[in-house]
């Protein structure tokens, strides 16, 4: 549920058209053909998605691939993709790799960005069959987020509970439909909030914006926790 809202953020903040990278079984072989070792599955899938986009687009375009200041593998994906693009002579494709740790200080409208993550997390707390109906048309304001959190929090939980953790690409795309199948079978899936992870990341990086968001996030949490567990 994050994609639509993050695209809306990018289009509003940079006044540019956005498209979603294709990541599936057809793009994976393209990425694997360019790798020589046992990389984590998300990297060849992501690389294949970029190469597929390069085949479909004849003109120049940019690919947004966030990086990190740490040494973890997924924070280094942009540099690997850039190397392959250079080797194939695809200089018209530019990789934009902002550091996650400094996003609130360096990106335009950080409040809008944070709300884009929050609404995705809230929708994941709703029953899967109600998510489309509950999804706001655009990135909601704080008052709308509070209303949405209270509404979702009032929905009685049903089904057996299962917590799922993992790398984001695997959780939301490269999973062969397993989470969807589990939800159809009545399992209630719980995921760690992406917005919470980013809030702690930004707080530890010294972001001043996190102090402004703390109270608002607490209100959302109380609204959400109104739902009996």
Per-region residue spans from a language model:
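An N-terminal assembly and electron-transfer interface module characteristic of large anaerobic redox
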Residues: 1-229
């Amino acid at each position: 549920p994050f994609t639509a809202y993050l695209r809306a953020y990018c289009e509003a903040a940079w006044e540019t058209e956005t498209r979603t990278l294709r990541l599936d079984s057809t793009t994976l072989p393209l990425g694997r053909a360019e790798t020589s070792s046992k990389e984590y599955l998300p990297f060849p899938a992501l690389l294949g998605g970029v190469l597929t986009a390069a085949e479909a687009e004849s003109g120049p375009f940019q690919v947004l691939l966030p990086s990190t200041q740490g040494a973890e593998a997924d924070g280094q994906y942009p540099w690997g993709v850039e190397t392959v693009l250079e080797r194939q002579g695809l200089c018209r494709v530019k990789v934009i790799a902002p550091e996650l740790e400094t996003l609130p200080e360096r990106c335009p409208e950080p409040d809008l960005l944070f709300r884009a993550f929050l609404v995705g997390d809230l929708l994941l707390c709703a029953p899967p069959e109600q998510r489309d109906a509950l999804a706001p048309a655009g990135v909601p304001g704080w008052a709308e987020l509070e209303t949405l959190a209270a509404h979702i929090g009032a929905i009685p939980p049903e089904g057996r509970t299962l917590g799922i953790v993992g790398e984001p690409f695997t959780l939301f795309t490269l999973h062969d439909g397993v989470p969807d199948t589990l939800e159809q079978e009545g399992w209630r899936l719980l995921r760690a909030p992406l917005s919470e992870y980013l809030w702690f990341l930004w707080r530890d990086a010294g972001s001043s914006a996190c102090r402004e968001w703390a109270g608002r996030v607490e209100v959302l949490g109380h609204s959400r926790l109104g739902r009996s567990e």
